[in-house]
């Protein structure tokens, strides 16, 4: 399985074939029987579909919700060449208000890079808040060790963020930055103090990181493709 792969020039058919031939050899050595990819390519790219079909892949592109491993539909913010002030000015008035409200109410934020020493208490706080979020919203949550290993593996390309109120962690996120994109990967919030809007401030801090890194896109990640008001 290659999440969001392949990582190469998808128009270079020779490179693509060499890449997948190599992947097939690895799969055979590991007794694999299936290769799955979730490429970051628009569904309207018919040439890519033809190229992948020629390589033996079958396109499954009819799902509207979260049937796959990676989301088919994402929400992205265009920040190419924009300053913080320009990006903030394009937010809805209520969004700007909530970002400022969090700071006004005394919410503070802190981040740790994956290539640095992340305090165990920070990882524990994030994992605990994730458990709270999972129970509230009814989804399975990864372990603390999983998040620690992921941050360590991604190194300087990942950050753990926590929001605090009166010294207590109340919200947390993990973001990753590669090339010209920054991804909001995980988010968690306490059942308490949600009225001080810590998530808005954390989102803004991650967007600021994306702007500082010269990114073109800030990706909020998965949303449903079914826009019906009746869709839960």
Model regions: which residues?
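Catalytic phosphate/metal-binding cores of nucleic-acid and nucleotide-processing enzymes, i.e., regions
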Residues: 1
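Short acidic, S/G/P-rich loop/turn micro-motifs used as interaction or catalytic elements
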Residues: 7-11
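Conserved acetyl-CoA-binding loop-helix of GNAT-fold acetyltransferases
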Residues: 13-25, 194-208
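Structural alpha-beta junctions
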Residues: 25-32, 54-60
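Conserved GNAT acetyl-CoA-binding A-motif
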Residues: 27-41, 210-222
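Tryptophan-centric aromatic hotspots in well-structured domains and transmembrane helices
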Residues: 34, 95-97, 200, 204, ...
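A conserved beta-strand-loop-helix scaffold within acyl/acetyltransferase catalytic domains
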Residues: 39-195, 207-209, 225-226
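Conserved catalytic-core subdomain
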Residues: 220-232
